[in-house]
Amino acid sequence: VFIMLLPSGYGQAMAAFVAQNYGAKRMDRANKALFYGIITSLCAGVVTGSLAFFYGDILSSIFSSDMSVILASHSYLKAYAVDCIFTAFLFCFLGYYNGCGSTFFVMIQGVIGAIGVRVPAAFLISQLPDVTLFQIGLATPLSSIVQILLCVIMF
């Protein structure tokens, strides 16, 4: 969860900034903020994602000394690391739409992502033979991709 603090913060800041500019009828500034927010959040996502992908075992060892738990959590964190890239886009878009007052859309795309994509994908992937936590974890970035597509369509 701590890996997602940066993109979450970007999303919240985006909502506040966009709301101010939406109210001032300066969507040019709101759109520019979305662009720069995505770029800088993407840079942060690459750094945190790389840490999780390459050093997830060290991060996991903070919480457990059991090597099987560390290896399993590192496997899952590798999939989570992939999502760090996508959440750079997604959370900025969600902040943008929240700032514009499109909260119903934010809710609907979240439900579609979680219930329509992530849960079914995780279930279906978990049914594969010799499945790993990495493979199951890929349901999360898959969901993010669908949610980003919805955000781009809405834009």
Please give the residue ranges for each predicted region:
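Alpha-helical transmembrane segments of multipass membrane proteins
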Residues: 4, 44, 48, 52, ...
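Transmembrane helix-loop junction
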Residues: 20, 32, 61-62, 75, ...
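Structural signal for membrane-spanning alpha-helices in multi-pass inner-membrane proteins
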Residues: 5-8, 52, 95, 121-122, ...
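Small-residue-rich hydrophobic transmembrane alpha-helices
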Residues: 1-56, 87-109
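Residue-level recognition of transmembrane alpha-helices
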Residues: 41, 77-80, 84, 110-111, ...
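Short membrane-interface helical motifs at transmembrane helix boundaries
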Residues: 47-70, 74
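Membrane-interface helix-loop junctions in multi-pass transport and translocation proteins
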Residues: 56, 62, 71, 104, ...
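Alpha-helical transmembrane segments of multi-pass membrane proteins
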Residues: 1-3, 67-93
